[in-house]
Curated annotation (Swiss-Prot):
Biased composition annotated in UniProt, kind: Acidic residues: 109-125, 153-166, 173-200, 228-261, 267-283, 358-374
Stretch list, region Disordered: 72-497
Tissue spec: Component of the acid-soluble organic matrix of the aragonitic skeleton (at protein level).
Biased composition (Basic and acidic residues): 72-81, 93-102, 142-152, 284-343, 375-397, 407-453, 461-491
Keyword Coiled coil: yes
Domain of life: Eukaryota
Keywords per UniProt: Coiled coil, Secreted, Signal
Entry protein name: Aspartic and glutamic acid-rich protein
Signal peptide: 1-16
Compartments, as annotated in UniProt: Secreted
GO cellular component: extracellular region
Coiled coil start-end: 319-465
Length: 522
């Protein structure tokens, strides 16, 4: 493909200007331009031919360049690298080095300290001596003497105190240390700062959370983060609710009617037992001084208690038990329906698999159709190449015919000279008459000979002009034959080849003044 593009561009750039400047009026000798000029009846016709030819060549050059540029752009795409913006690099970079450097940059106190680090890093990269690591910045990372002494506190601090006081002091000291660390982390991570907020958003997008990422994040920042991701947490709670409903459905599926009866029976027993306890307590208060009299033990019977209840209370209890039983029955039916849903999902999955198989078969049919179209295009390209070769052979045959006509003109000129010699031997009157006729015929023969030469030169010139383009057409056809899968480029090139072949069929052997201008499809 690159070779084909190079040939097209080279032909258009190297042959266009010589074709335009072919005719040189200042040339002293009898040139092809003079012969071509004499083949026209008037100067206006000759100038019209020149203008038309220059216009056709310009159109040809534009046509070739318009076809070559898209191919060039395909092979050499434009650079689409992002802008080297420092802020966007620190915030949006996803490679390991960039992300580590972003965290390292946040650890410096001010911009000057980081610039010092950046300068050392760049110098090490330029010299290629070694990699920059954390040991290069030990001096910057050193803590003040007070904090070092605070961190180096050991058992000697508590030697003079009792053991319990030592333990309490250690716990207070550890709590103070953790509080100081949290304050430092909160001070480093300001959620109102745009850079830290963008950092959290970028990490949320890439899903790279670790416990260390939220070590210094304040409670307010975490609440805002949960609000932003409320939908995700809602989805998780919905999944948990579905699991609970499935477990409840399994429990009710075992024996929902027994469950409802037992629940009702337990409630009635509890209520009856409470009434019974109240009665026994009242009786014991009345007869608490009578120690000899024994309290008869009551035997609780829920069914009898229910039968002995007043009529309105009996109806109320019956209605409540029916309502509970109906509710439990509805819940069990809903749970059973939810359990049956996986079977429907399996059927839907099988239907989707069948649809996918049908789509795959359809894609196979389309692929076979594309292969058939590619083979047909290949045959058409070969046919176009054969027609181009036939056109070139026909041009050579016309050139041979022109040479034959030139030989016939020379033969006529020789016969005229012989007639002139024979006329000199005859009488003066007849000789002069024949001499005039011979001179006239000689002039006619000379004119015919010059016209034949001009026609031959014009045909040779036209063949030279058409030969590179015919060669390009053959190469284009061969390219399409080798790469039939490039369908879009193939269709466009095939249409241009057909138009160009039609033009050459109509005008390849016509006289220059009768040739029609070459027009390309835009």
């Amino acid at each position: 493909m690159k070779v084909f593009v190079y040939l097209l561009v080279t032909f258009s750039l190297t042959n266009a200007s010589p074709l335009r400047n072919r005719f040189n009026e200042d040339h002293d000798e009898f040139s092809k331009d003079d012969m071509a000029r004499e083949s026209f009846d008037t100067e206006e016709m000759y100038n019209a031919f020149l203008n038309r030819r220059d216009s056709s060549e310009s159109q040809l050059e534009d046509h070739l360049l318009s076809h070559a540029k898209p191919l060039y752009d395909d092979f050499f795409p434009k650079d689409t690298s992002p802008d080297d913006d420092e802020d966007s690099y620190w915030l949006e970079s996803r490679n390991d080095d960039g992300y580590d450097l972003a965290k390292r940059k946040r650890g410096y106190d001010d911009e000057e300290a980081y610039d010092d680090f950046d300068e050392v890093d760049d110098r090490a990269d330029d010299e290629g001596a070694r990699d920059v690591d954390e040991s290069d910045f030990e001096e910057d990372d050193k803590l003040p003497a007070e904090e070092e002494s605070k961190n180096d506190m050991d058992e000697e601090t508590f030697e003079d105190e009792p053991e319990e006081d030592k333990e309490e002091a250690r716990e207070e000291f550890a709590e103070d240390e953790r509080a100081d660390e949290r304050e430092d982390d909160d001070a480093d991570f300001d959620f109102n700062d745009e850079e830290d907020e963008d950092e959290v958003d970028n990490k949320a997008e890439s899903d790279i959370f670790t416990p260390e990422d939220f070590a210094g994040v304040s409670d307010e920042a975490m609440d805002n983060f949960r609000d932003d991701n409320e939908e995700e947490y809602a989805d998780e709670s919905d999944d948990e609710a579905e699991e609970d409903s499935e477990e409840t459905a399994d429990d009710f599926e075992d024996d929902p009617e027994d469950e409802s009866d037992e629940t009702f029976r337990d409630e009635v027993e509890d209520e009856s037992e409470e009434n019974y306890q109240d009665d026994t307590e009242e009786g014991s208060e009345i007869k608490q001084n009578d120690e000899t009299e024994e309290q008869p033990e009551k035997k609780f019977d829920a069914d009898k208690e229910h039968e002995d209840a007043p009529e309105p209370l009996k109806e109320k209890l019956s209605d409540e038990s029916k309502a509970r039983a109906e509710d439990e029955s509805d819940k069990s039916e809903d749970a059973a329906k939810e359990i049956k849903e996986p079977e429907d999902a399996v059927e839907d999955f099988e239907d989707g698999a069948k649809v996918s198989e049908d789509e795959a078969e359809l894609l196979d049919d389309e692929a076979e159709l594309s292969d058939d179209e590619a083979e047909l295009s290949k045959d058409e390209a070969e046919q176009s190449s054969d027609e181009a070769e036939k056109s070139e052979d026909k041009a050579e045959k016309s050139e041979d015919e022109a040479e034959l006509s030139e030989d016939e003109a020379k033969q006529s000129e020789d016969e005229a000279e012989k007639a002139e010699d024979a006329a000199g031997k005859e009488s003066n009157d007849e000789g002069k008459k024949r001499e005039d006729e011979a001179v006239k015929s000689k002039g006619i023969a000379r004119d015919e000979s010059e016209f034949a030469k001009a026609k031959k030169s014009n045909l040779a010139l036209k063949r030279d002009e058409n030969r590179p383009l015919a060669k390009g057409l053959r190469e284009s056809a061969a390219h399409l034959r080798d790469f039939p899968s490039e369908k879009k480029s193939k269709d466009a090139a095939q249409g241009n080849i057909e138009n160009e072949l039609d033009y050459f069929k109509r005008n390849a052997f016509a006289d220059s003044k009768d040739a029609e201008p070459y027009e390309f499809d835009k």
